[in-house]
Amino acid sequence: MKILHHGAVNGVTGSCHELQLDDKQGILIDCGLFQGAEVSGDKSSANDLEINFPIAHIKALVVTHVHIDHVGRIPYLLAAGFEGPIICSEPSALLLPLVLEDAVKIGFTRNKQLLNQFQSVLNKRIVSVPYGKWHPVFEGLSVKLKPAGHILGSAYVECQVGRARQRKKMIFSGDLGAPYSPLLATPKAPYSCDTLVIESTYGDKNHEGRSSRRKRLQQIIEKAVADKGVVLIPAFSIGRTQELLYELESIIHQSSDKPLDDSLKWGDLEVIIDSPLANDFTKSYRQLKQFWDKEARKVLSQGRHPLSFENLLTIDDHETHLQTVRYLQRTARPTIVIAASGMCAGGRIVNYLKALIEDKRTDILFVGYQAQGTAGHDIQTYGERHGYVELDGKRYSINAGIHTISGYSAHAGQRDLLNFVKRMRHKPREIRVVHGDEEAKREFKLRLEQLLGDSTEVVIP
């Protein structure tokens, strides 16, 4: 039995891990897309989407959550001949077809008949599994999904291999969420395992607390309004967008009658989601209220609607998108715009950036990790020194204000990751650190070794 890594070993994207029982049977945990300059373990890049490892023995795919860097290569996996089930949580079973339809449109075809055929195949493969229940995959292997607190439907995966005294337990963390995130319950540490494969996106840093980051969010908006400008927030269509809406509704609800400036109250500030996919996900989030945390359900019981409030405008069609970009470029009306992609590597956010990034009144707020090689990473890196960024082959000066609030990353910080291990009753004998930049992985490995001593071997694959 061994664990192989086909992604998220040289960065944070392209997650794909294999638990191989022998040369005749194994499973995959995730099958994600590479983004930016990141590559796989065998140096396959974001532009090389082929499945370049043997899959004849792969009996099932287990999905931790539906972000594209964890599921984006599923169409290629199916095209390569994979015929097993796609196992995921109940919320992910609803969300996954939306994500992959969008991925197929971008990477393969927009032909409606072919899209319908793909969705038909996908829906037959998806097996939804309740949280906390053992699910037999084949003889000698069962999996259990536990809430990971990253996005709705996210899970870490417990794999139980063998029988009785020879039984081994492997855990794949997927992406773990930060505690006290909007809408989601804090993930609980597992009881025990033999081997833990754990992410390290923020293995070298901690996030600010929720009340602090909400205060900063409010301050950034107040600054932009004072500057008579637009706040642009590049965000993943799923997860971060809904968390931001929840926080914005809360700020607006508490301050609705308070003036932002001489002519605008909080209650009159427009919030725009310009992303058809984000709008679809937000509708699905509303359908999945039973999976929200206690705080969010309490807000609903008060008659409030944190994902569909009065100030919220949604844009679906492309012409309205272009009209909105031109209008904001012309007027710089104080507005909050949330648009994909989260790393500015395409999507509608790029048009807003081209129109507004050179305007000093604009503020750009990053709320998620920016992978090397993406426009988002360049803006974040060179913005403070008023450098430039290349968008669609043209250079743009970065005159906008650049801000980062890491707590909305939906990822656990270093302290949270350490607590996930620390709170296990029986510690793993081996920990494999993946899904992080080199510095983050090294720092997290060091902290784990300090915590666990010689009883656990900590490796970076």
Predicted regions and their residues:
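Generic long, charged, amphipathic alpha-helical segments
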Residues: V389-V421
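His/Asp/Glu-rich metal-coordinating catalytic cores
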Residues: M1-V62, H67-V71, Y76-E243, E247-W266
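Short secondary-structure boundary/capping segments
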Residues: E101-I106, S212-R213, L248-I252, R286-E295, ...
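A short, acidic, amphipathic alpha-helical segment used as a generic capping/interface helix at domain edges
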Residues: G347-L356, S409-R425
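Hard-cation-handling environments
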Residues: I220-A375, E390, V434
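A short helix->loop->beta-strand "cap" motif at the edges of active sites that frequently abuts
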Residues: Q25, G81-P85, D227-G229, G267-L269, ...
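Short, compositionally biased "basic patch" segments
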Residues: S40-D42, P182-V197, Q290-R297, Q370-S397
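C-terminal structured "cap/appendage" subdomains that terminate the fold
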Residues: L417-L448
